[in-house]
Amino acid sequence: MIGRLRGVLVEKQAPEILIDVNGVGYELQMPLTSFYELPEVNHETMVYTHFVVREDAQLLYGFITKQERALFRLLIKTNGVGPKLALTILSGMTAGEFVGCVERDDIVTLVKLPGVGKKTAERLLVEMRDKLKSLMEASAGSEREFVLQSNYSPAPTVNSAEEDAISALISLGYKPPQASKSVSAAYKEGMDSETLIKAALKSML
């Protein structure tokens, strides 16, 4: 199993990246919370990975922290949640925010994420409660530490903020008209794409 990669970031287009490790290029998909912590292209980076083997493909998922990867692994063990939906959930909110939703039984916020219906949200709240407790105990011994380690201070991003934001939202499962409308409504002069995506997502939750 590939558990971690360190190499040069060759390409990045949310939610996918390409890392060159000693001449071998690895394609990964990442939640936006991790994606926007990456350095600029042609700089070295390190990501924790989760490897998925399917009949028709072999896929790598990347994460900036072990905590986010651990939460991803718990999510895909939930009935009805596959890697794609888990990635969408972790792109729509930080790991810490997800923990908060589970703690509060906040089904209203969860169902606003693309692909998360009422039944799926209910399963997440029920099945993740005990799993999260074990995860937090294993990672740091407290919810507070887990939440602190799972939230990021976003790095500056690229130009064409509106185009990048719309593309990222579509990749998460939002319909193009909805993505475009939300991005346009949230945009303010000088916003970078990461800030704009967060603002657009917040307006839809």
UniProtKB/Swiss-Prot annotation:
GO terms for molecular function: ATP binding; four-way junction DNA binding; four-way junction helicase activity. GO terms for biological process: DNA recombination; DNA repair. Its main location: cytoplasm. SMART domains: HhH1 (SM00278). Residues 157-205 are annotated as: Domain III. Residues 65-143 are annotated as: Domain II. InterPro entries: DNA_helicase_Holl-junc_RuvA_I, Hlx-hairpin-Hlx_DNA-bd_motif, NA-bd_OB-fold, RuvA, RuvA_2-like, RuvA_C, RuvA_C_sf. Keywords: Cytoplasm, DNA damage, DNA recombination, DNA repair, DNA-binding. Residues 144-156 are annotated as: Flexible linker. Has three domains with a flexible linker between the domains II and III and assumes an 'L' shape. Domain III is highly mobile and contacts RuvB. Belongs to the RuvA family. This is Holliday junction branch migration complex subunit RuvA.
